[in-house]
Amino acid sequence: MFYLFLADGFEETEALAPLDMMRRAKIEVKTVGVTGEFVTGSHGVTVKADLKPEEISFNNIDGVVLPG
């Protein structure tokens, strides 16, 4: 499982391109809203995160993505 962390002001291309590529490759990835359930990027795109930080399981983690 990979976690892609999102905070308000994230760079949409840096977050959504890797997310799209990982999902197309059937890699299990969930978005985590650091600043809330709905996170707005630097260009006004709002994304609904899959998880809240307290819902993360560190028992089966393969990696994290931290977009700018």
Feature locations, PLM:
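Extended, subdomain-level signal for the structured scaffold at the beginning of enzyme domains
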Residues: 1-68
